[in-house]
């Protein structure tokens, strides 16, 4: 099976062709919003971080910024910084260049002479990139070039019974095609980590699965918290989920039945053609999705029982529900109804084939519901308050 995408100079393949206006910190975010509004074909996001962070949090921010610029769906990037933030322009550019050789321009507001001059400069850079990007034509590539991210949010009992297993079926099909599938949300492995660990391809991966889960539990204990006090969420419980273990058993279904070949830290570059891998992300949907997109995911497949509009600035998000009432109520937001699996009118295998074909169409340019509505939620994981 093949799809039509955009070949990048670093060898990877995009399914979208965007110019990214990248804010290096919160102090540049409003400026990038104004810039992007003036250049059709560009995208940006509201970066609430980039300054006054402890080292581990700053690394998260740097990895996401570099990963976004390197994501195959991006033609080129205009980085905009204020000039005095911790995420200095030279550090951001260096991090990006370690991942990709795609077009890159930089604007520092303080050095440009203020906001208006910085906007004028960045708009000219972005306009030139958009014009260059428009000349590219889609080419045919095997599905092995795809990296999909898998996510679940607003879960209810149908998530573990239908939509998550359906994503798992897609994951196995992508792996069979030679592609890569990312399983995320470490906090929702808790209580089911032993099942995942049994599927580890190597002893090192086995140990890493336990390590990332135990690290989350210990971090919460250090501040006097218990993960089960906030997970399942009130919405999960209202939907019918009873406990964290039930939620976790549903969550790991998104990984299908393939061996787990690697465990990646948050936002780190994921290698293509690696089969099933795990990324150590929070359970929070926008920040988990951001980590996978920073890792190189071109498409995200998202299961929801209660319904959610979540999207992403760079990657199309395919939304799936196993709850037929949610599908009827939020059809404007949901791409796939997986409830026939529960009612026995369709099999997991047949719906899996349909979802693979939809994923192929999205890779070729078909817009998802989140894309057509303009949803671009974005958050970056953190472990500590500002300093």
PLM feature spans:
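Metallocofactor- and cofactor-centric catalytic cores in central/energy metabolism, strongly enriched
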Residues: 1-151, 155-299, 303-387
């Amino acid at each position: 099976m093949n799809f039509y995408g955009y070949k990048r100079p670093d060898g990877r393949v995009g399914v979208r062709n965007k110019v990214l206006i990248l804010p290096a910190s919160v102090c540049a975010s409003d400026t990038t919003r104004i810039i992007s509004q003036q250049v059709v074909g560009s995208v940006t996001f509201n970066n609430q971080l980039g300054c006054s962070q402890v080292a581990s949090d700053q690394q998260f921010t740097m990895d996401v910024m570099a990963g976004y610029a390197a994501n195959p769906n991006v033609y080129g990037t205009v980085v905009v910084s204020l000039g005095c933030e911790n995420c200095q322009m030279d550090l951001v550019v260096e991090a990006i260049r370690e991942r990709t050789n795609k077009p890159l321009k930089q604007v520092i507001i303080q050095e440009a002479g203020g906001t208006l001059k910085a906007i004028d400069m960045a708009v000219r850079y972005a306009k030139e990139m958009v014009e260059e990007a428009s000349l590219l034509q889609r080419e045919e590539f095997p599905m092995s070039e795809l990296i999909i991210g898998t996510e679940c949010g607003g879960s209810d009992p149908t998530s573990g019974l239908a939509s998550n297993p359906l994503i798992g079926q897609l994951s196995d099909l992508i792996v069979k095609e030679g592609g890569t599938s990312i399983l995320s949300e470490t906090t929702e492995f808790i209580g089911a980590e032993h099942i995942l660990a049994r599927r580890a391809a190597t002893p090192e991966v086995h140990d890493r699965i336990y390590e990332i889960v135990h690290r989350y539990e210990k971090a919460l204990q250090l501040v006097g918290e218990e993960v089960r006090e906030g997970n399942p969420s009130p919405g999960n419980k209202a939907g019918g989920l009873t406990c964290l273990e039930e939620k976790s058993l549903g969550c790991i279904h998104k990984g299908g039945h393939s061996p787990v070949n690697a465990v990646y830290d948050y936002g780190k570059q994921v290698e293509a053609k690696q089969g099933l891998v795990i990324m150590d992300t929070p359970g929070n949907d926008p920040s988990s999705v951001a980590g996978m997109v920073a890792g190189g995911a071109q498409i995200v497949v998202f299961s929801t029982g209660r319904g959610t509009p979540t999207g992403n600035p760079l990657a199309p998000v395919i939304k799936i529900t196993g709850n037929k009432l949610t599908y009827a109520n939020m059809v404007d937001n949901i791409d796939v109804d997986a409830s026939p699996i529960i009612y026995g009118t369709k099999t997991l295998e047949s719906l899996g084939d349909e979802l693979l074909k939809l994923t192929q169409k999205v890779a070729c340019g078909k817009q998802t519901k989140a894309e057509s509505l303009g949803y671009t939620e974005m958050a970056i994981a953190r472990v500590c308050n500002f300093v």
